[in-house]
Swiss-Prot record:
Family annotation (Pfam families): Ribosomal_L27A (PF00828)
Compositional bias per record (Gly residues), positions renumbered to this chain: 26-38
NCBIfam families attached to this UniProt entry: rplO_bact (TIGR01071)
Organism of provenance: Gloeobacter violaceus (strain ATCC 29082 / PCC 7421)
Function comment: Binds to the 23S rRNA.
Gene name as annotated: rplO
UniProt name for this protein: Large ribosomal subunit protein uL15
Basic residues biased stretches: 15-24
Region of interest (Disordered), residue spans: 1-51
């Protein structure tokens, strides 16, 4: 077998084309207008329109509304309850998502329970939740209740 040498390497047949010489007469195939047609902006040197140009009409990228903000990829959702919703519960009762669903205070859950401080804590409650606001914790403990943060 003959050894392969660099000077013997040639491109495959049909893979290389000669550069098309435009504007060099009729017989060359691309004479006179060089394949650009007759007159107009597109036939001129440097002619053409910018990307997105629609002939003077308001282009699509300007007709569409601008995006407002962005959407989170993995948004976190919580089940929210305010202290004013807990005013009808009996004193010293255990409060968590299950008991709130049973009592009819919540109709559905959408994540961990968060207790917010809107309203007053009238009775002592033992509340178990994932998060308490500072005002909610203060009002619950002032009424004699306890706040337990679940992991």
């Amino acid at each position: 077998m003959k050894s392969l040498r660099l000077e013997d390497a040639v491109p495959q047949s049909g893979s290389r084309h000669r550069k098309l010489r435009v504007g060099r007469g009729h017989s060359a195939g691309q004479g006179k207008t060089s394949g650009r047609g007759m007159r107009g902006q597109k036939c001129r040197s440097g002619g053409g329109v910018r990307p997105g140009f629609e002939g003077g009409q308001i282009p699509l990228y300007m007709r569409l509304p601008k995006l407002k903000g962005f959407e989170l990829v993995n948004p976190s959702s919580y089940t929210i309850v305010n202290l004013k919703q807990l005013r009808d519960l009996p004193a010293d009762s255990e409060v968590n998502i299950e008991t709130l669903l049973d009592a009819g205070i919540l109709t559905a859950t959408s994540g961990p329970l968060r207790v917010l401080g809107d309203g007053e804590a009238h009775v002592a409650l033992q509340i178990t939740a994932a998060y308490f606001t500072a005002s909610a914790r203060e009002k619950i403990e002032a009424a004699g209740g306890t706040c337990t943060v679940e992991a």
